[in-house]
């Protein structure tokens, strides 16, 4: 272990911070970039607020972009159409 200089704050010690900034990549190398990356990317733990997805509202023109479901013919009863044999 290297000796720790008591005159330097702990967050300024050499090796306390990675040389490159964190990014949004989730590859294996970036997941082990630093402790924060490992927790958020590697383990998937996030304590931030979850973004609520807005529902898409139908347009005010009254038209929906969906075709109506066509009526399907009633199905034929299964089995012998002449009825049960005795």
Curated annotation (Swiss-Prot):
Its main location: host cell. InterPro entries: IV_Tat, Tat_dom_sf. Residues 1-48 are annotated as: Transactivation. There is a cross-link at residue 71 (Glycyl lysine isopeptide (Lys-Gly) (interchain with G-Cter in ubiquitin)). It is found in: Host nucleus, Host nucleolus; Host cytoplasm; Secreted. The modification N6-acetyllysine is found at residues 28, 50-51. A motif (Cell attachment site) lies at residues 78-80. The record marks 11 as: Essential for Tat translocation through the endosomal membrane. Residues 22-37 are annotated as: Cysteine-rich. One of its GO terms (molecular function) is RNA-binding transcription regulator activity. Asymmetrical arginine methylation by host PRMT6 seems to diminish the transactivation capacity of Tat and affects the interaction with host CCNT1. Acetylation by EP300, CREBBP, GCN5L2/GCN5 and PCAF regulates the transactivation activity of Tat. EP300-mediated acetylation of Lys-50 promotes dissociation of Tat from the TAR RNA through the competitive binding to PCAF's bromodomain. In addition, the non-acetylated Tat's N-terminus can also interact with PCAF. PCAF-mediated acetylation of Lys-28 enhances Tat's binding to CCNT1. Lys-50 is deacetylated by SIRT1. Zn(2+) 2 binds at residues 25, 27, 30. Gene3D superfamilies: Tat domain (4.10.20.10). Residues 38-48 are annotated as: Core. Residues 60-77 have a biased composition (Polar residues). This truncated variant has a premature stop codon. It may have arose as a consequence of tissue culture passaging. Belongs to the lentiviruses Tat family. HAMAP family: HIV_TAT. This is Protein Tat. It comes from Human immunodeficiency virus type 1 group M subtype D (isolate Z2/CDC-Z34) (HIV-1).
């Amino acid at each position: 272990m290297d000796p720790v200089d008591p005159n330097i704050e702990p967050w300024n010690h050499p090796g306390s911070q990675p040389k490159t900034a964190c990014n949004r990549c989730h590859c294996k190398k970036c997941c082990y970039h630093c402790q924060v990356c490992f927790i958020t990317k590697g383990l998937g733990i996030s304590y931030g607020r979850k973004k609520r997805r807005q529902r898409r509202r139908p347009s005010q023109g009254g038209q929906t972009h969906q075709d109506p479901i066509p009526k399907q013919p009633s199905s034929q009863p299964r089995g012998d159409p002449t009825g049960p044999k005795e």
